[in-house]
Amino acid sequence: MSEFLPFSRPAMGVEELAAVKEVLESGWITTGPKNQALEQAFCQLTGNQHAIAVSSATAGMHITLMALEIGKGDEVITPSLTWVSTLNMISLLGATPVMVDVDRDTLMVTPEAIESAITPRTKAIIPVHYAGAPADIDAIRAIGERYGIAVIEDAAHAVGTYYKGRHIGAKGTAIFSFHAIKNITCAEGGLIVTDNENLARQLRMLKFHGLGVDAYDRQTWGRAPQAEVLTPGYKYNLTDINAAIALTQLAKLEHLNTRRREIAQQYQQALAALPFQPLSLPAWPHVHAWHLFIIRVDEQRCGISRDALMEALKERGIGTGLHFRAAHTQKYYRERCPTLSLPNTEWNSERICSLPLFPDMTTADADRVITALQQLAGQ
């Protein structure tokens, strides 16, 4: 059998090793100059005013919700078709996640679904830029402005995604992920961008014990060594080891995403003759980052179920992913929302399958996946 082809693999090279070596030899390995450089680089990439690096996108979501004073009695609108960390953070703060449906073919949450879910208790809206494509963020942001509700963009899939000529996160507040399977990675990490100066100040405190300054800030600016707690906070800072890797990856972003796009185009061309249905692309002008390439496997149409297809691909040495099982079908949320019905979400959650897609894949790797799909179609 051929070597196992994973669903994803980080694209690491000698540059990342050199970046880590530089940090280790510098004597400053925790939050410091590399964090500052990463934050500045993301302000430049997105065009936004403030950037706050954190230990994960989940941490970023947690402190953003906290900074917006979301808590007991509040509601936060989010698609169910998302990673459960968003709903977990909402729930842990005592608020209620209000899960809404998505468009059947793009899997994007729609402005109409969001607006129909708004109540007097709605405190925030969290749209997801799904799989590397952008949601209709202008329309969603307009709803937030009309009702006076905060919009927090889940941009975990969207490093390199553009909407109407502007990078995701160009305005408002957005949260990016540097997890191992993301378009750029530092193993674990995340970053928040915002144009709200007061929010940025609160996020910096909340990510580091509630202190007004961190250790590097005190050393660099000669501020008093006895930092004062201004509010209870967390330990969500990113180390400079991680930040150095993320910076190195960011310098490669165009190359990495170009390769992802090439593989996606190879899949798209082949799938035109197969019963497996890829996602539709959004109608608005955009640049797709191709974080994921997803097909829908409808048993009646394809002659094989999604789960059977994934198992058959595994037997052929090909890995796959599932992004995502609908959150409202998970035990904790199912018990709390037993009557919730989201038809488009449920239909897709039972059929979606993420194919291998990462920059170090070869054309032959993609051909191998395509050949397997051709063999399995109609079985």
Swiss-Prot record:
Enzyme class: transferase
GO molecular function, one term: pyridoxal phosphate binding
Name this polypeptide is given: UDP-4-amino-4-deoxy-L-arabinose--oxoglutarate aminotransferase
Keywords: Aminotransferase, Antibiotic resistance, Lipid A biosynthesis, Lipid biosynthesis, Lipid metabolism, Lipopolysaccharide biosynthesis, Pyridoxal phosphate, Transferase
Entry GO CC: membrane
Family membership noted in the UniProt record: Belongs to the DegT/DnrJ/EryC1 family. ArnB subfamily.
The gene coding this protein: arnB
Enzyme Commission number(s) from the entry: 2.6.1.87
Gene Ontology biological process terms, A to Z: lipid A biosynthetic process; lipopolysaccharide biosynthetic process; response to antibiotic
Modified residues (N6-(pyridoxal phosphate)lysine): K182
Function noted in UniProt: Catalyzes the conversion of UDP-4-keto-arabinose (UDP-Ara4O) to UDP-4-amino-4-deoxy-L-arabinose (UDP-L-Ara4N). The modified arabinose is attached to lipid A and is required for resistance to polymyxin and cationic antimicrobial peptides.
Pfam families: DegT_DnrJ_EryC1 (PF01041)
Cofactor or coenzyme needed: pyridoxal 5'-phosphate
Reaction catalysed by this enzyme: UDP-4-amino-4-deoxy-beta-L-arabinose + 2-oxoglutarate = UDP-beta-L-threo-pentopyranos-4-ulose + L-glutamate
Protein's pathway: Nucleotide-sugar biosynthesis; UDP-4-deoxy-4-formamido-beta-L-arabinose biosynthesis; UDP-4-deoxy-4-formamido-beta-L-arabinose from UDP-alpha-D-glucuronate: step 2/3; Bacterial outer membrane biogenesis; lipopolysaccharide biosynthesis
Subunit structure: Homodimer.
